[in-house]
């Protein structure tokens, strides 16, 4: 292969980048069409170690990559052309940065001489993601730059990264080689001669050891910490942290475990899952105010009542366990932060508390709320909370559950049922936007083909409508449950001072339904208005090998009215 040709050298650099990323652990590459990224696109087309995913909209593509990275627990590469194509990744990059999800953006770019001079589709791309991505700027491919220098640059940029990396790749024309040789990384190429050993192996050129800072308390510190009335709080926890170990820890110490919607433990029968509602239950709140020690795993709590409880309580000792060095406490409590994941921290030598079982009455109160929700939600009027509970109760071991922002995730946090088993649960609660939710769910479903359910609001679905094209490409079950209350009815729960203002400037009623959208993308579609029909449609959709839509139409005030009614019941308990 001749390397003096610009198009050929561009292609070699693209192939070196993708080969090294595959060796580092990347399994998926998400690609949008474009000309300036051609060296990366052609290299990806021949790369057999990566699974390719294509979509025409970079915003949805970025969120699909986010879902793939969440599910695979490995970095995912994204290829885009130059210009606003890169900018459209910004929302997904922000979400990934805040939640420590590794995405690797490979953006094609114009060479330096075509920037700031009116050249077509040319913007300043380095630094486009501000502090939400590590930035690497590659020069235009040059035969005088050793290929091993390119590999070590990639290795250093990506190794041990838990957050997004932006690798900006400048290419001069011509971009398209006259012929596409196989393989691109030809062992006979003089340019690749320094990499002969690397080409014959399958490991990265530079192998970085795993870097993980872990800090643990001493046995004496643990003994002093558990000496008193305490609570354990499970915040946002990923499946690989083995959150189930918190159940055993709670039982060993003798402290109640209060669980957030994102903890993987919200429905566990041994946890106090209804904590959001219990904090407005007078007897339960009075009991919880006796606690003077708290052990928090993770952060990004959903319940404002739980956040307020942690902020207002006078803690003798406040410990927080985080896998990364973050500040995840908007209340700025005085505390000791330990760097470890939940599995590591629960494996320490824990002692029985001197006040073990001090809050056992919480179990009774939690059961009271369980019975209240069965009676008033499951056997009450058809509505959003009833559907959320039905999904959470249906075949959980078979599937993964992605819960959309705004009202759906709050309904799950407030009213999820107790269950012997729970689906693996995902959310996008870093920046908590309503964009890209369907695309993220598509990424989750695409990784291994596990049946996946998405609970999403109508405005969120309208926001991500063209990601139905990604959903259409799936060959495994993705059940898209749209809770259509005709607008942003989360604002019914907020103190907007005037109903007309609420309707005109916050709720944004649209009067739309999603049947025609389903037809446009040729997706199976059902609209339901009762629980029996929903359950029949839902079970059928879980068995369908592809994406399907179930639309649940309710009034604008159904959920908010029911929440107000249930709040009244709880407060009078």
UniProtKB/Swiss-Prot annotation:
SUPFAM superfamilies: DHS-like NAD/FAD-binding domain (SSF52467), Thiamin diphosphate-binding fold (THDP-binding) (SSF52518). Transmembrane segments: none annotated. InterPro entries: DHS-like_NAD/FAD-binding_dom, MenaQ_synth_MenD, MenD_middle, THDP-binding, Thiamin_PyroP_enz_TPP-bd_dom, TPP_enzyme_TPP-bd. Keywords: Magnesium, Manganese, Menaquinone biosynthesis, Metal-binding, Thiamine pyrophosphate, Transferase. Disulfide bonds: none annotated. GO terms for biological process: menaquinone biosynthetic process. Its EC number is 2.2.1.9. Pathway: Quinol/quinone metabolism; 1,4-dihydroxy-2-naphthoate biosynthesis; 1,4-dihydroxy-2-naphthoate from chorismate: step 2/7; Quinol/quinone metabolism; menaquinone biosynthesis. The keyword Protein biosynthesis does not apply. It holds the Pfam family TPP_enzyme_N. One of its GO terms (molecular function) is thiamine pyrophosphate binding. Binds 1 thiamine pyrophosphate per subunit. CDD domains: TPP_PYR_MenD, TPP_SHCHC_synthase. The keyword Nucleus does not apply. Its cofactor is Mg(2+); Mn(2+); thiamine diphosphate. It catalyses: isochorismate + 2-oxoglutarate + H(+) = 5-enolpyruvoyl-6-hydroxy-2-succinyl-cyclohex-3-ene-1-carboxylate + CO2. Catalyzes the thiamine diphosphate-dependent decarboxylation of 2-oxoglutarate and the subsequent addition of the resulting succinic semialdehyde-thiamine pyrophosphate anion to isochorismate to yield 2-succinyl-5-enolpyruvyl-6-hydroxy-3-cyclohexene-1-carboxylate (SEPHCHC). NCBIfam families: menD. Belongs to the TPP enzyme family. MenD subfamily. Homodimer. PANTHER family: 2-SUCCINYL-5-ENOLPYRUVYL-6-HYDROXY-3-CYCLOHEXENE-1-CARBOXYLATE SYNTHASE, PROTEIN PHYLLO, CHLOROPLASTIC. This is 2-succinyl-5-enolpyruvyl-6-hydroxy-3-cyclohexene-1-carboxylate synthase. It comes from Shewanella sp. (strain W3-18-1). The gene is menD.
């Amino acid at each position: 292969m001749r390397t003096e040709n610009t198009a050929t050298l561009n292609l070699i650099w693209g192939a070196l980048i993708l080969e090294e990323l595959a060796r580092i652990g990347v399994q998926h590459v998400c690609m949008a069409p474009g000309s300036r990224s051609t060296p990366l696109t052609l290299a990806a087309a021949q790369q057999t170690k990566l699974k390719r995913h294509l979509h025409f909209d970079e915003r949805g593509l970025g969120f699909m990559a986010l879902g793939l990275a969440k599910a695979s627990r490995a970095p995912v590469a994204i290829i885009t052309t130059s210009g606003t194509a890169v900018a459209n990744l910004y929302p997904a990059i922000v979400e990934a940065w805040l939640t420590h999800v590794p995405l690797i953006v490979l953006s094609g770019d114009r060479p330096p001489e075509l920037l700031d001079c009116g050249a077509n589709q040319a913007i300043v791309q380095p630094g486009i993601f501000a502090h939400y991505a590590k930035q690497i700027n590659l020069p235009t491919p040059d035969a005088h730059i050793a290929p091993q220098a390119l590999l070590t640059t990639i290795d250093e940029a990506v190794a041990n990264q838990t957050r997004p990396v932006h690798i900006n790749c400048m290419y001069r024309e011509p971009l398209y080689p006259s012929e596409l040789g196989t393989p691109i990384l030809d062992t006979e190429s003089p340019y690749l001669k320094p990499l002969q050993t690397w080409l014959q192996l399958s490991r990265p050129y530079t192998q970085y050891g795993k870097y993980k800072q872990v800090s643990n308390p001493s046995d004496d510190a643990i003994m002093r910490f558990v000496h008193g009335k305490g609570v354990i709080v499970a915040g946002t926890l990923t499946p690989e942290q083995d959150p189930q170990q918190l159940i055993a820890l709670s039982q060993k110490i003798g402290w109640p475990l209060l669980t957030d919607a994102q903890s993987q433990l919200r429905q566990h029968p041994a946890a106090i899952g209804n904590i959001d509602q219990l904090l407005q239950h007078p007897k339960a709140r009075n009991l919880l105010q006796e606690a003077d020690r708290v052990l928090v795993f993770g952060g990004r709590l959903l319940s404002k009542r739980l956040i307020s409880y942690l902020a207002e309580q006078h803690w003798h000792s406040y410990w927080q366990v985080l896998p990364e060095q973050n500040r995840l406490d908007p209340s700025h409590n005085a505390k000791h932060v330990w760097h470890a994941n939940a599995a590591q921290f629960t494996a320490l030598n824990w002692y029985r508390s001197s006040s073990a079982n001090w809050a056992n009455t919480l179990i009774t109160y939690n059961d009271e709320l369980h019975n209240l929700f069965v009676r008033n939600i499951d056997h009450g009027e058809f509505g959003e909370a009833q559907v959320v509970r039905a999904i959470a109760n249906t075949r959980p071991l078979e599937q993964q559950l992605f819960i959309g922002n705004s009202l759906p995730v709050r309904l799950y946090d407030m009213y999820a049922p107790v269950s012997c088993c729970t689906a693996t649960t995902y959310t996008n609660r870093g920046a908590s936007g309503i964009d890209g939710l369907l695309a993220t769910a598509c990424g989750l479903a695409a990784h291994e083909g596990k049946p996946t359910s998405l609970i999403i609001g109508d405005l969120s679905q309208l926001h991500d409508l063209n990601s139905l094209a990604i959903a259409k490409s799936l060959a495994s079950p993705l059940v898209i449950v749209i809770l259509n209350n005709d607008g942003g009815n989360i604002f019914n729960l907020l103190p907007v001072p005037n109903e007309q203002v609420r309707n005109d400037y916050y709720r944004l009623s649209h009067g739309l339904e999603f049947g025609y959208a389903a037809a446009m993308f040729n997706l199976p579609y059902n609209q339901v208005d009762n629980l029996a029909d929903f359950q029949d449609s839902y079970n059928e959709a879980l068995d369908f090998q592809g994406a399907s839509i179930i639309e649940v139409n309710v009034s604008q005030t159904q959920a908010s009215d029911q929440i107000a009614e249930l709040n009244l019941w709880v407060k009078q308990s």
